[in-house]
Amino acid sequence: YGPDDPVKIEYISQIPNMKSIVTAVYDTPVGEVWSEESINALKKTTLEHGLEFSVIESVPVHEDIKLGKPSRDRLIANYCENVRRLGKAGVKVICYNFMPVFDWTRTTLAKKRKDGSTCLAYDKKDLLKMDPINGEFSLPGWDESYEKDELKKLFAEYENVSEDKLFDNLKY
């Protein structure tokens, strides 16, 4: 849940047996420390709607950490401070994703199932049709925080990062 979601917390809280909500602070740049005011405002809104505030969807991991750049020490310290602040606010679970560049990949957010319900889905064939640098690079859920020039530069930086190097950078 976020304040800009089409389904408002007022409606989510009306779902039978709904006890908690997964949310995040969305107005702070990746790598920066989330303000206690933002965290507490999110907690207040959640609790006011009768929901538990115990799970955060993501504290994004800055690309400089994944790439092993010199700025990673400051960014890791900021990440740790976010974890401390969330713990102080009562958060027990922080979901994270260390996937380079796009955070997560789905090709559709509403794949129709046999029973008429919908779910998130990934189809490699759909993904392979896209060219994120020279053509279309929008997939459901991507925040599109990179301009094409920035994306091209980031892809070039990752060309020199093997799977082992990425894991070394994450273990650092």
Predicted regions: what they are:
Residues 35-54, 58, 75:
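An N-terminal, globular interaction/scaffold subdomain
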Residues 2-15, 42, 74-84:
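Short, acidic/polar
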Residues 1-3, 23-28, 58-61, 98-101:
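Active-site beta-loop-alpha junctions enriched in small/polar residues
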Residues 19-22, 50-55, 92-95:
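Structural preference for beta-strand elements that scaffold enzyme active sites
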Residues 12, 21-23, 46, 86, ...:
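Conserved, mostly hydrophobic/aromatic
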Residues 15-16, 89:
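Structural motif
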Residues 24-40:
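Glycine-rich, proline-tolerant flexible connector loops at the mouths of alpha/beta enzymes
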Residues 65-172:
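Active-site acidic/histidine proton-transfer and metal-coordination neighborhood
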